[in-house]
Amino acid sequence: YGDYLDTMYTPEIADKNAAWWKEFRAGMEEVNPDVFLVGEVWEPNTDRMVPFVQDGALQNTFDFSLASELLEVAQSEHNGGFVSELCEVFDKFGFASNGKFEDCTFLTNHDQNRTMSVMEGNEDHAKTAASLYLTLPGNTFIYYGEEVGLQGMKPDQNIREPMPWYE
């Protein structure tokens, strides 16, 4: 894969320990020193996420806690300590990774109800959420259809509809 693999998405990384991911990353970097790994950690407790960004295990993880908070802040129209919590998490991960951690921000993904449905069709709330996560530091990921306000609630077939290219 040396000439072809630059990015790898690693779902549900919590089923392996951080030492395993550190070894995996080292092996990937032997093939391509510029490899970009993104880990999916469904973990609301940021203290339990630290080992995955520590000592070079992963430098990028999807931040599910942040995604939930962004949606909540936008929908409720109240900060509720969000900014101070965010700064605390960024400091914690930055320290643990020797400044190499980059957050991977998103609002929803292929396993979740779509943003516009979560916002109950409120376009202003959806735009507020988008404005927040698109201006945060790190790497932004947009689930297809979010940019045009697609709606959809679980089950999966309702959130994985084809993109309406001609509407």
Predicted regions and their residues:
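Active-site and adjacent substrate-binding regions of carbohydrate-active enzymes
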Residues: 1-167
